[in-house]
């Protein structure tokens, strides 16, 4: 249960700051030197990018067993090493993907008084927001967002969904329905690649009907000093599985590589970016990795992305699956629940991987 009913300070919309044509960003968005992105006058408009694995899910449904095995192996390797990969032929039509992004661009272009009708609070975070965490005086990120629940049905509240633009709720319903299908499919693949029954991870989440599904739409306005701030600070996702529909025009998602360098991801056309969350890392006993990532901002272009989070039921125990714990591979994490776990980011905001590290079992 979240004890926080309201934000500790008045909320300022980053979009309003950006549209005021200020020459310098307010101090509360300026990151400490150690956290600032490596953006110079030479690369701040077009950061150097790299491609993370692009996996064709359609190859899993051919008659070619060798190709199926190769595809499963590619997914397994990505989950174990980088924690991120892109998927194409994932089952959602390009038209629906484009429609969803266009609808949310319309929402963020609405007059501020209409958007503020959906202003959120730290009690549930549902609605239109501009900060994560409730620490007074915290350094904030350069972004606004909209957060809503899709499942389980007990948490789904259409009154918390935007009513404008027209047909927004219908498009959201179609989009989230397809997202759940993709997540359920990926959960089967992840289970099989661990040598488990294909429903094992899903059951560990509490089953299909009780697993959580929520959408966070991120809006990153133009920023006059992108070298001083971040759209989202470094963090690993606290939930289970994240499916990101990125902005193909503005590359800004960065993933921390094995050498600790930040890799800017080049989105593939009409692909989703998939990453493991902390709950999957714990259930897999760290076989699968949830990896730190962050978002840089741009002086000339705003960016919009849709992140769908697929999470365990809030009160089910989350701990390394017994099938993956042996004498040689003891349990690396103590038991928790997702409800307890996510209070960390809801109170303190994005903080690297410090929370999952706190749950490591003493050796």
Swiss-Prot record:
GO terms for molecular function: dioxygenase activity; iron ion binding; jasmonic acid hydrolase. The keyword Oxidoreductase applies. It comes from the Eukaryota. Keywords: Dioxygenase, Iron, Jasmonic acid signaling pathway, Metal-binding, Oxidoreductase, Plant defense. InterPro entries: DIOX_N, IPNS-like_FE2OG_OXY, IPNS-like_sf, Oxoglu/Fe-dep_dioxygenase_dom, Plant_2OG-oxidoreductases. Residues 210-312 form the Fe2OG dioxygenase domain. The keyword Transmembrane helix does not apply. Jasmonate binds at residues 216, 342, 346. Coiled coil: none annotated. Pfam families: 2OG-FeII_Oxy, DIOX_N. Disruption phenotype: The quadruple mutant jox1, jox2, jox3 and jox4 exhibit reduced root and shoot growth, delayed flowering, reduced seed production, constitutively elevated jasmonate and jasmonoyl-L-isoleucine levels, and enhanced resistance to the necrotrophic fungal pathogen Botrytis cinerea and the herbivorous caterpillar Mamestra brassicae. 2-oxoglutarate binds at residues 218, 220, 303, 305. Fe cation binds at residues 235, 237, 293. Its cofactor is L-ascorbate; Fe(2+). Its EC number is 1.14.11.-. One of its GO terms (biological process) is regulation of defense response to fungus. It is an enzyme of class 1 (oxidoreductase). Belongs to the iron/ascorbate-dependent oxidoreductase family. This is Jasmonate-induced oxygenase 3. It comes from Arabidopsis thaliana.
């Amino acid at each position: 249960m979240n004890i926080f009913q309201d934000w500790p300070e008045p909320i300022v919309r980053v979009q309003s700051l950006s549209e005021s044509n200020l020459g310098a960003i307010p101090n509360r968005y300026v990151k400490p030197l150690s956290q600032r992105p490596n953006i110079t006058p030479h690369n701040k408009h077009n950061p150097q990018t790299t491609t993370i694995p692009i996996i064709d899910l359609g190859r899993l449904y051919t008659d070619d067993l060798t190709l199926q095995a190769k595809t499963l192996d590619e997914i397994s390797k990505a989950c174990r090493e980088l924690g991120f990969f892109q998927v194409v032929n994932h089952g959602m039509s390009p038209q629906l993907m484009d429609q969803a992004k266009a609808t949310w661009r319309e929402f963020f272009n609405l007059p501020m008084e209409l958007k503020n009708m959906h202003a959120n609070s730290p009690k549930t975070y549902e609605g239109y927001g501009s900060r994560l965490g409730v620490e007074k005086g915290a350094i904030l990120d350069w972004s606004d967002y909209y957060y809503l629940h899709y499942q389980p049905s007990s948490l789904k509240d259409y009154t918390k969904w935007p009513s404008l633009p027209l047909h927004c709720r219908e498009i959201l319903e179609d989009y989230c329905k397809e997202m759940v299908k993709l997540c359920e499919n990926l959960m089967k693949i992840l289970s099989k690649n661990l040598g488990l029954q294909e429903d094992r991870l899903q059951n560990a989440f509490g089953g299909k009907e009780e697993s959580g599904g929520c959408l966070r739409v991120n809006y990153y306005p133009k920023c006059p000093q992108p070298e001083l701030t971040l759209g989202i600070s470094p963090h690993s996702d606290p939930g289970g599985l994240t499916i990101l529909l990125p902005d193909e025009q503005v590359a800004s998602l960065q993933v921390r590589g094995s050498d600790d360098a930040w890799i800017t991801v080049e989105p593939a056309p009409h692909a989703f970016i998939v990453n493991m969350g902390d709950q999957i890392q714990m259930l897999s006993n760290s076989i699968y990795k949830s990896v730190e990532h962050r978002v840089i901002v741009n002086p000339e272009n705003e960016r919009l992305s849709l992140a769908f989070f697929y999470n365990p039921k809030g009160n089910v125990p989350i701990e390394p699956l017994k099938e993956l714990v042996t004498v040689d591979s003891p349990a690396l994490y103590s038991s928790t629940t997702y409800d307890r776990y996510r209070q960390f980011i809801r109170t303190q905001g994005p903080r690297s991987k410090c929370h999952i590290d706190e749950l490591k079992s003493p050796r």
